Amino acid sequence: MTARLQEFYKEQVVPALMKQFGYKSVMEVPRFTKITLNMGLGEAINDKKVIELAVGDLTKIAGQKPVVTKAKKAIAGFKIRQGYPIGAMVTLRGERMFEFLDRFVTVALPRVRDFRGVSGKSFDGRGNYNIGVKEQIIFPEIEYDKIDALRGLNISITTTAKNDEEAKALLNAFKFPFRN
C-alpha cells in the first residue's frame, strides 16, 4: 500500500509542476529523495543516558532506528574526544518518507507554539530545504509526561530540484505553510 502523499504526488503534483515549469518528461519533475532527521546532543558528553533517550525519541518520531553519530575528531574546547557519541540521525526514504512528511505538515507543524509558517529562506541553493524544530513534543508520538528534557532536531528535505524556485513549488504543492 502506497502512502497518501505518494499517490497525491503522482496524480496531482506531477501534472501541475510539468505545466508550471514546462517540463517535457515526467522524470524532469522534482521529487523528494530523502528526509534526514538529525539531533545534535552536546550534553551527551557528561551523561550517557541522553543518547539512549534521544534515540528512543527519534525512533518514535521516524518509525525506524536512528544511527548514533560519533565525533570525527577531538576538540579540547568542547571536551570531546574522537569517537564520542554526540548525536543521532535517521534517514527516511520511500514510503516512510512520505508518511513522515504527511504527519509533519498536517499534525506536527500546527502544534508548534506561536506558529506563523516556516521560513521560505531556508533553501540551500540546490533545491534542498532545512527546518529546525525547537521541541520534539510537537510530534504526537512523543508523550509529554515521559520526556526528560526538550530537545530540538534538524529536518533536512532533499529533493531532485535544480534550484530553490523548483523546490519551493514542490513543497507548496504539498501544502507546506510558508510565511514569506
From Swiss-Prot:
The entry's keywords: Ribonucleoprotein, Ribosomal protein, RNA-binding, rRNA-binding, tRNA-binding
SUPFAM superfamilies recorded: RL5-like
InterPro entries assigned: Ribosomal_uL5 (IPR002132), Ribosomal_uL5_bac-type (IPR020930), Ribosomal_uL5_C (IPR031309), Ribosomal_uL5_CS (IPR020929), Ribosomal_uL5_dom_sf (IPR022803), Ribosomal_uL5_N (IPR031310)
Keyword Coiled coil: no
Claim: Ribosomal protein is one of the keywords in the record: yes
GO BP, sorted A to Z: translation
Entry's Gene Ontology molecular function annotations: rRNA binding; structural constituent of ribosome; tRNA binding
A GO CC annotation given for this chain: ribosome
Entry function: This is one of the proteins that bind and probably mediate the attachment of the 5S RNA into the large ribosomal subunit, where it forms part of the central protuberance. In the 70S ribosome it contacts protein S13 of the 30S subunit (bridge B1b), connecting the 2 subunits; this bridge is implicated in subunit movement. Contacts the P site tRNA; the 5S rRNA and some of its associated proteins might help stabilize positioning of ribosome-bound tRNAs.
UniProt record similarity statement: Belongs to the universal ribosomal protein uL5 family.
NCBIfam families: PRK00010.1
PANTHER family: 60S RIBOSOMAL PROTEIN L11-RELATED
Subunit structure of this chain's protein: Part of the 50S ribosomal subunit; part of the 5S rRNA/L5/L18/L25 subcomplex. Contacts the 5S rRNA and the P site tRNA. Forms a bridge to the 30S subunit in the 70S ribosome.
Designated name of the protein: Large ribosomal subunit protein uL5
Species the sequence originates in: Cupriavidus metallidurans (strain ATCC 43123 / DSM 2839 / NBRC 102507 / CH34)
Lineage: Bacteria, Pseudomonadati, Pseudomonadota, Betaproteobacteria, Burkholderiales
